[in-house]
Amino acid sequence: MTKVLPEASRWKQVGRISLWRYTEHDRNFPGWYLNADAAGCRSLLLLIESLSVDGEGHRTVEIAEPTEAQLRVPNNRGGLAPWTAPSKLRIALVRESGVWTFPPGIDPAILTVGTAWVEPLREGVSGIQLGRGDYSIGTGKTGLPLWFWW
């Protein structure tokens, strides 16, 4: 009998994906900031879809530091505000619908979402490659919000 591997275990990352948060001035710029090139967006969308098919699970994504151009888009102090970025992001999907946890830790950064957050996450990542962003998802009660930037 052949064991069927979860969809997410077959996922392979491609493209450039950046994630960061600001270490100062966070009252006006709270949470995590996500940007990716077109290949990175497609890769993240495939991961989200794979986790959805599996119903639960997790994968770790390699993170690139944001470029100067990426940092200028949110315009926190003209792109010069201090920031920190993880080298890895663990994305986990759990069956409990409303779960959202995204603590500030960076070793690795860990985003855990319930099924209700799958579609908003998918829409946000899709929007990056279309030049849409400057909005966030997530709750401040159990984790930092996630901002999408092009």
Language model features with spans:
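Positively charged, low-complexity terminal tracts
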Residues: M1-W150
